[in-house]
Amino acid sequence: MSRKQKLILITGVVAVGLFALLFPKLRYYYAAFQKSTNTSSVTILIPSKVEALNIEVIATLLKEKGVLNDVAAFELVGENKEMNARNIAPGKYIIEPGTALRHIWNGFKMNSNHNGNAEQTVKVSFENCRSLNDLAGKLQQQLESDSAAFMAAFQDANELNRLGFTYEQVPALFIPNTYEMYWDQKPQAFIEQMAKEFKNFWTPERMDKLKHVGLTTPSEAVTLASIVYSEQSKNAQEWPIIAGLYLNRIKQGIKLQSDPTFKFCWGDQLKGVQRLLAVHRDVDCPYNTYKIQGLPPGPIYLPPVGVVDAVLNATKHNYIFMCAKPDYSGTHNFTASGAEHIQNASAFQRWLAAELKNR
């Protein structure tokens, strides 16, 4: 073999070696700079379960969502970045059109706060909740955890004790509003966030008002607000009047005798019942204010913030009776006279009987 031939051979071997050495890197860089194929923003939810936190499952998910055409390229980038269940952060992500594959993986990577670098928060709202079960159901629709997991957290006696609540009182912890949190936030973390919101809500000013109206704890105020709202959910102008009425009864040692409290005892059994009877009212139940003295052990509803403030700013008057007006206004007649209350109640019953008869 001539010297020239040897030189050509050596050059060829070196070239092949360099190509073999550089090809994986060239292949990676080509893949890393490829871009997503979606033409509009795509929301991706990566579950917390370990089996979902791997390259192949995520690649399949993105392909199904129309984000990828070249699954192999996406998997190659993930492998090169050593992505796995230990550093992939579950949660909600938004993939914008034309996002480089390397940037997608960088977004999924867990940071020091244990969130993904590009993880998005979600807005969580809950209103019109009659019970903790209702609340858990609403949360299940907006967050990763199911209602059973939330209920288990709500019933954790050690945690409730740490926060200073009984199970009956804990509905007062949850202030209806819209909050920002991560989709994969666990029930325990949700409760911790609500505890902070509760502390922020109960300012020194509100605590002073609480004492001024004769109540001792925020739970009592929310419990009374839940009764007020259950009596009147449409006309906010009546909230401070009704609150003042019940506070008068508490101060005078008169049972609250609120129909919504005994209805609460029956759960869904009275759903659709238009005329409440004595047999319904006579149920033995710690929430039935026809049977017990003072407030029930906890809220019968998660009342809006405005009703809680109406309790704290209750109207001063001498009313101790209220009765629905005999019309469709949804408002009430208030009085301090037992005789006048009987007249108001009779007028309402006559009107209701006539309306039911005409249907």
Give the ranges of each region predicted by the language model:
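Intrinsic structural disorder
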Residues: M1-I10, L45-E51, V57, E64-L68, ...
